[in-house]
Amino acid sequence: MDKKKLLLIDGSSVAFRAFFALYQQLDRFKNAAGLHTNAIYGFQLMLSHLLERVEPSHILVAFDAGKTTFRTEMYADYKGGRAKTPDEFREQFPFIRELLDHMGIRHYELAQYEADDIIGTLDKLAEQDGFDITIVSGDKDLIQLTDEHTVVEISKKGVAEFEAFTPDYLMEEMGLTPAQFIDLKALMGDKSDNIPGVTKVGEKTGIKLLLEHGSLEGIYENIDGMKTSKMKENLINDKEQAFLSKTLATIDTKAPIAIGLEDLVYSGPDVENLGKFYDEMGFKQLKQALNMSSADVAEGLDFTIVDQISQDMLSEESIFHFELFGENYHTDNLVGFAWSCGDQLYATDKLELLQDPIFKDFLEKTSLRVYDFKKVKVLLQRFGVDLQAPAFDIRLAKYLLSTVEDNEIATIASLYGQTYLVDDETFYGKGVKKAIPEREKFLEHLACKLAVLVETEPILLEKLSENGQLELLYDMEQPLAFVLAKMEIAGIVVKKETLLEMQAENELVIEKLTQEIYELAGEEFNVNSPKQLGVLLFEKLGLPLEYTKKTKTGYSTAVDVLERLAPIAPIVKKILDYRQIAKIQSTYVIGLQDWILADGKIHTRYVQDLTQTGRLSSVDPNLQNIPARLEQGRLIRKAFVPEWEDSVLLSSDYSQIELRVLAHISKDEHLIKAFQEGADIHTSTAMRVFGIERPDNVTANDRRNAKAVNFGVVYGISDFGLSNNLGISRKEAKAYIDTYFERFPGIKNYMDEVVREARDKGYVETLFKRRRELPDINSRNFNIRGFAERTAINSPIQGSAADILKIAMIQLDKALVAGGYQTKMLLQVHDEIVLEVPKSELVEMKKLVKQTMEEAIQLSVPLIADENEGATWYEAK
């Protein structure tokens, strides 16, 4: 007889989590009647994921019945102070209940009791009847119910990631038993439920007390023996409050429910009515997947484990997935791969198949349909397989359609209704427990991932076509992935000995600064401790408290606080200098050494699908954040050198590309004229805004202020922000901005128009159809709406600038290949491209690179690329 399994879901909590998991896409989730549906959709995905994984024989979703419960009768402020439930969420609740009805899932609520009490009562009844129980919630209150029969899962991220609490896991994570978890909440209180707890007792202190005394009762039995302290005083004063909090936090496992376990038998959905409901909600993908279970998927797609390969297993229409165990494909291992052919799915962990002549020849001669081409190209290069540019990259396609969430396969599955795939953390585990399971289970996981890709590829293609974004994928992002893969494989030589020399020099500087700080302080202390520094500055040295704010951990010594204090306290300037050099030392001078591989190079990874504007970022290590303003930061670039002695590094950097894009997009005649005439744009702006007649009369301060206004406008800066940047009053800053818009009316018109369009469409686009979703553009919250409006203004500018650089890189790579040059692109940092150029090609290459970048696209103003070359990146910059 199959084991009886009961799934108990805290419906109110999980629905709320589902709402906010898809909140950034709020305006995309509306049905034809205008009803928001993101919570309904997310709730359904959570349910389907749980049904697939838990396979319950019995199930119940419990809801809170209302604000008045037996707890509010004993403590009127219980759950008081909670923010108002968003109307967009409230309107979906009746439909969540309707969804449950159609899915054949019992739901229940009980006057005067909370969902937790219903769950707790059924949990104990089910234990007595021999059930295995899984409880699911969005908050941790229910953890107290875990025992040898009950697992409590708390949703962590999105709609499919949960943290499973058992007694062993709770002990491992917190050192507590389930009963002690109640006592911890009694001590800490709970802001979300407005449970008071004991004043200034947090999690760390609460756990310490419970480990010492065993329970809340034990703490108070031993309180007389505690040392005199503020904590002891608070415990004594708040004793009544602590025991009230324990009562409030304890789940009632004997609630007078009117249902029994026999009422919770799960026999599946009412397919016909559920399909109609999906139609009403506009859930097309869910409708298509309605009759599919994981077993159906595996059987329908003919999953086969492969140890040998033949030509009839391969097709130009095949879709591939290559599984990396880890994140860094330059160093971590390929562990298996899967591919489709017609209706068949194949999966293998036999990596030697990559050397099979049939397979290797196919891979190298076919433009693959694949997930994450750049990763795959770099990985397979390690096996001697050299891929062509891709036919279709599913990861990049998803990224172009939505930048709100990540682009992992599990996320794609959640978004498009494939409920049979578990996320990698759930499947492999995490931390020291992360491991590949037995072979058949592992390969089935790869097959499920591939099934998601097979099912979603046509959906993504259709949506890209509807958005007019196929050209963006085929002509920009996919060719760029090929270029970036080649750059990553090439890497750049970084001389460790140079970094070691810098490390030694910096250590002397840090030691000297430390001694100078001690002398000014009149004592020795830990300069790296914000707490000790705060006490020194604001208590011992008596610096003005209005410059800082005090939190639970002490006085704020953040950079903005210290910069305001620096003019009045010499020690603060030294501390700022110390922090800057210490940061450079630890993060870059020492940090970069760990990323130099056996070939003497750093192989950074360019992340193509992270930013919402389309800009590239780099990780492992991040080379885009190497400090450029400080000389000590710039010196790090001396360690970056060419691979060959007869070569140099050539750096080519777009000049003021975002302002040039702004001129083109806004069609402002004055800005266009200044760029067309080759004028210094900041000097020209200063003349127009400050009423200066001649360029010669523009001071350095005038130009600096004009530059701040120019770039501030690009980022939608406020008068408050500009006043902080320039150290002037808000009134002066507002006058600058008002005058700027008077003198450059095209820019003001652009800003107004792009915000209007964003409100209508819910998104903005670059010159090349790259979209930035703006779900908050019509928010009733002024601050949230204001941020969305600034984003609407900036994204087409910043995104178009990023796109132009991508076009230049693609065209430059084509030119290098066509000309048979030895020159290689090595790095892309912000608006800069760094190449290694043989000296014999330098004259020709400087001309080619400059021409390619400046002619990447025709704007109404010229694009300008500035070049420098040198024996190191430092000299080239």
UniProtKB/Swiss-Prot annotation:
Reaction(s) the record says it catalyses: DNA(n) + a 2'-deoxyribonucleoside 5'-triphosphate = DNA(n+1) + diphosphate
Domain 5'-3' exonuclease: 177-270
Source species: Streptococcus pneumoniae (strain ATCC BAA-255 / R6)
Every 3'-5' exonuclease domain range: 302-465
GO biological process, one term: DNA-templated DNA replication
Superkingdom of origin organism: Bacteria
Primary role: In addition to polymerase activity, this DNA polymerase exhibits 3'-5' and 5'-3' exonuclease activity.
SUPFAM superfamilies registered for this protein in UniProt: 5' to 3' exonuclease, C-terminal subdomain, DNA/RNA polymerases, PIN domain-like, Ribonuclease H-like
Alphabetized InterPro entries for the sequence: 3'-5'_exonuclease_dom, 5-3_exonucl_a-hlix_arch_N, 5-3_exonuclease, 5-3_exonuclease_C_sf, DNA-dir_DNA_pol_A_CS, DNA-dir_DNA_pol_A_palm_dom, DNA/RNA_pol_sf, DNA_polI_exonuclease
Subunit architecture: Single-chain monomer with multiple functions.
Family per similarity comment: Belongs to the DNA polymerase type-A family.
Protein name: DNA polymerase I
Keywords: DNA damage, DNA repair, DNA replication, DNA-binding, DNA-directed DNA polymerase, Exonuclease, Hydrolase, Nuclease, Nucleotidyltransferase, Transferase
PANTHER family given in the database record: DNA POLYMERASE I, DNA POLYMERASE NU
EC number(s) recorded for this UniProt protein: 2.7.7.7
Alphabetized GO MF terms: 3'-5' exonuclease activity; 5'-3' exonuclease activity; DNA binding; DNA-directed DNA polymerase activity
